[in-house]
Design a protein with these regions (language model features):
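Conserved G/P- and acidic residue-centered "switch" motifs that form tight phosphate/ATP-binding loops
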Residues: 25, 77, 110, 140
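Acetyl-CoA-dependent GNAT
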Residues: 46-106, 177-180, 189-191
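Conserved catalytic-core motifs of GNAT/GCN5-like acyltransferases
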Residues: 133-136, 153-170
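A short, well-structured alpha-helix characteristic of acyl/acetyltransferase catalytic modules
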Residues: 1-55, 180-192
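Conserved active-site tyrosine of GNAT-family acetyltransferases
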Residues: 147, 152, 174
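Conserved acetyl-CoA-binding loop-helix of GNAT-fold acetyltransferases
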Residues: 108-122, 141-149
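Conserved GNAT acetyl-CoA-binding A-motif
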Residues: 125-135
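Amphipathic alpha-helical recognition patches that constitute DNA-binding helices
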Residues: 28, 96, 114, 131, ...
């Protein structure tokens, strides 16, 4: 890529944008996937090798039930995370959401809230989804508060559904429906 070429900004917000993941992003994705703190907080159990990163990229490029992006801060075009929709089940108009802000310096800056708004607007507005769901490791209180702030509601707990550090932990299931998302957009501004 030459200096004059610009990457496609797919979903654009005020401070961040989402763009399709590219091969050059895999070093960051792999670093985050192998970070012990991030793995603990997200429930990821398998380290990512270079071959695994290449397989991941191929999967997100070809899987019709998945869309995947990197989260980029507009100022400086700095990649800070990844986000996507997976297990899209078109007949029921449902999908699961995943987001990781892997750059720890970007934690607590509101980038995740903006990125998730962009992704949910895409899911509900463009893909015509009815329901977006996710799972959260029960001891990750910060993530639970974050998802509640952006409109997700707890709908159940998989008791002892996650094993980490020689102990079982709960896994909290959450979701947001299209009408709830639209009401938040019109009302309180999705936690902004």
């Amino acid at each position: 890529m030459t200096g004059s070429e610009e990457k496609v900004r797919f979903l654009v917000g005020e401070r961040v944008y989402l763009r399709p993941i590219e091969k050059e992003d895999l070093a960051d994705v792999r670093r985050w996937a192998n970070d012990p703190e991030i793995r603990q907080l997200t429930g990821e159990v398998t380290p990512m090798s270079q071959a695994g990163a290449d397989e991941f990229l191929e999967r997100v490029r070809t899987d019709k039930e998945r869309v995947w992006f990197v989260v980029v801060v507009k100022e400086g075009d700095r990649v800070i995370g990844e986000a996507g929709l997976l297990r899209i089940f078109w007949p029921w108009r449902t999908t699961d959401l995943s987001i990781i802000i892997g750059d720890k310096e970007a934690w607590g800056q509101g980038y995740g809230s903006e990125a998730i708004r962009l992704l949910m607007d895409y899911a509900f507005g463009y893909l015509n989804m009815h329901r977006v769901s996710l799972g959260v490791v029960g001891f990750n209180r910060r993530a639970l508060r974050f998802y509640e702030k952006v409109g997700f509601k707890q709908e159940g707990v998989q008791r002892d559904g996650y094993y980490h550090d020689h102990a079982y932990h709960d896994f909290v299931m959450m979701s947001i429906l299209e009408d709830e998302f639209r009401a938040m957009q019109q009302g309180e501004g999705m936690g902004s």
